[in-house]
């Protein structure tokens, strides 16, 4: 079955392991933010679709040649996605239009091409940040800030999912379940699973009073993030 793998920038393993790992992960991220890695071409015509696919194939070929064995493919950015979702809209980087259908499923294509090359493909999902006001406005009624108002909070001209609201982990679980149940991903990679930087005034005081249960604010927030990981891990394993 599909495994769920959470990779973090800081390893909890000793710096010098006593034994060699059975499987060495040599991974690279492929980001879609601003088209920094991919895509450069908009999928608005048959030729554009073909070129967009070719751009991804070229990246995968170069990674394979460089002896990488794992691709962390950006699957969710900030409240929008790069796969056919019933929950969130397509990212505008694909077609130039929010929610615009690129004429194919980028995640399915990435998985297929990775597997052809003997590489794993993990769904890289940004979790808590939802983007700035301009980005959120561009999503319109499709934005989670419109559909799930209770779990979204504005902070310093940006929007975030609220880790302290119990429904947040359920919403993220819906997204992960959608990906894991529909696609042959080899793992799920969580990014930005944290509170915003320098967030002493992050607006979660109501939830802290309601759910804090005697903990300090800092401990409660740490527990919230741990609970999200545990909830989704257990949920996927139970599928």
Regions inferred by a protein language model and the residue ranges of each:
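Boundary at the C-terminal end of the N-terminal hydrophobic targeting segment
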Residues: 15-19
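Hydrophobic faces of well-ordered beta-strands that scaffold small-molecule active sites
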Residues: 26-30, 71-73, 121-123, 188-190
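N-terminal post-signal-peptidase region of extra-cytosolic proteins
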Residues: 45-61, 91-107, 174
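Polysaccharide-binding and catalytic clefts of secreted carbohydrate-active enzymes
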Residues: 68-69, 76, 104, 117, ...
